[in-house]
Amino acid sequence: METLAAIIVLSIGLIGMAVLMSNMMTGGARSRYMSEGAMLASEKLEDLERYPAADPIVAVTSGAIAGSLSSDITASVTSNGSTDSVDYFDTVQLSVSGGNISETSSGKDASGNTNFTTITHAPTGEVTSSIVTTLPAPSADTLTFERRWTIEKDAPVGGVRRITVLVTLTNPVVVKSVNFQMSMVRP
């Protein structure tokens, strides 16, 4: 009888340890994806910050807000006599295969056409770049993130703009979705 009780107590303890280990593995993976989301949000904020205030990419010319965090928005923006087609979203793929680290991001060429630039870093130090017109098919290890951003005029006070970037992992390899949002205020 005592042996049976000891086996039951031991079994419960081992099952508890297995559940704990599973949760630790999932939490560790989710932390990795949150960290990558934070890096991509920060990268986009820095990218948008480099434009002059009157550039169509960051100008809010009609209404109080440009862009959307809930859907992909493209707008025709005129500022300082220049009219540009501006996307308030992009896609970034990160992949590690064969020792190479690749990042593919979407953008527009001089004619306003969407293209995808892939930059690959090899272990030898070689860096290659390629541009294609369609998003490359993801491999099994590819993480695909979607970034959307808004630019708010006179928020939180007059004379400044608040830029908010939302990064979402679109092919989650973990059960819980991964979203990361970051904002900055600039004149």
Model region roles, listed by residue range:
Residues 1-43, 51:
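Aliphatic-rich helix starts adjacent to a transmembrane/signal segment
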Residues 35, 39-187:
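Low-complexity, Gly/Pro-rich coil/beta segments used as flexible assembly/activation regions
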